[in-house]
């Protein structure tokens, strides 16, 4: 990473964290993270959609909005997007459209909820359904912690949207890495403010670096890599700094952290076909059973209580 990108990334991280602190009001940072990280993720999916559609339709000299209005084009772009991206965001639900609504003071939180519902419904029946199912469930837009009225909640989310729009997320060719790194930075910052809760979803950089270096020693290509207690997926994803990893497998007990792990995979540019993150207790039910992995890393909750049931002896 050259110095200019590194400097930009540092500036981006600082701005995002300052924004998170400025907007959260009286809400605990640990709770507010679901809204900030959720909207950054939505921004990424929307931005990715815009670029994908521009490239897909460039030879037809037609905009995404116009293609959507034409039934024949609409069917084709939906099919292509589901195959390549795994989801569809309608033109009216793009992040840039929400920015315009905020500027015109016509945005309300129910529109955002409709946008999320539409995105999630687009994955139903597709190969990506399991990877996207419930991804935004922790971003509870009807929570009174966000505001006591729809107007109050809309105002908070409008500020987040406007603030994200003002941030320069990076150079085109490096956008995934810069945004992915910034996302991971925020996870780390939220972890630091959460105290004892931090271990649920984040392995500190130093231990993570050492684990991945040792696990990939002498390896160039890794077909399958796994983390049985994957948290937010940051440790598992760090493996790609030391080897070419094709498929990622993880299991996470906490549903909120499980959602973070899947978001993290997608933000890092891992295709939905190349990761399988499962929500459940690895000790009680190992989702991957007798599968063999070339590399495994883990930072399990060492102090957690667990059952001494006799079936563990089998």
Residue ranges of model-derived segments:
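Non-catalytic, mostly N-terminal accessory regions of nucleic-acid modification and defense proteins
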Residues: 1-215, 273-282
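Conserved S-adenosyl-L-methionine
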Residues: 197-298, 303-305, 310
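Conserved catalytic motifs of ABC-family nucleotide-binding domains
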Residues: 312-314
């Amino acid at each position: 990473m050259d110095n200019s990108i590194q400097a930009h990334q540092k500036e981006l991280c600082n701005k995002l964290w300052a924004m998170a602190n400025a907007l959260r009001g009286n809400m605990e940072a640990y709770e507010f993270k679901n809204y900030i990280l959720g909207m950054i993720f939505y921004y990424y999916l929307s931005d990715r959609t815009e670029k994908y559609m521009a490239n897909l339709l460039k030879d037809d000299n037609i905009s995404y909005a116009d293609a959507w209005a034409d039934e024949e084009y609409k069917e084709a772009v939906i099919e292509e997007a589901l195959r390549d991206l795994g989801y569809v965001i309608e033109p009216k639900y793009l992040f840039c459209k929400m920015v315009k609504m905020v500027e015109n003071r016509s945005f309300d939180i129910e529109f955002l909820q409709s946008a999320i519902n539409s995105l999630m419904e687009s994955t139903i029946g597709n190969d990506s359904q399991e990877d996207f199912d419930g991804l935004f469930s922790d971003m509870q837009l009807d929570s009174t912690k966000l505001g006591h009225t729809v107007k109050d909640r809309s105002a908070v989310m409008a500020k987040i949207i406007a603030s994200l729009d003002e941030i320069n997320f990076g150079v085109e060719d490096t956008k995934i890495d810069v945004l992915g790194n910034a996302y991971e930075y925020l996870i780390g910052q939220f972890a630091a403010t959460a105290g004892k809760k931090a271990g649920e979803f984040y392995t500190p950089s130093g231990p993570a670096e050492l684990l991945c270096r040792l696990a990939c020693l002498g390896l160039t290509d890794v077909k399958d890599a796994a983390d049985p207690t994957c948290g937010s997926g940051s440790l598992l994803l760090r493996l790609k700094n030391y080897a070419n990893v094709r498929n990622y497998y993880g299991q996470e007990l906490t549903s909120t952290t499980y959602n973070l792990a899947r978001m993290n995979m997608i933000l890092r540019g891992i295709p939905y076909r190349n990761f399988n993150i499962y929500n459940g207790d690895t000790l009680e039910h190992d989702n991957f059973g007798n599968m063999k992995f070339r590399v495994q890393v883990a930072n399990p909750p060492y102090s957690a209580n667990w059952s001494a049931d006799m079936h563990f002896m089998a």
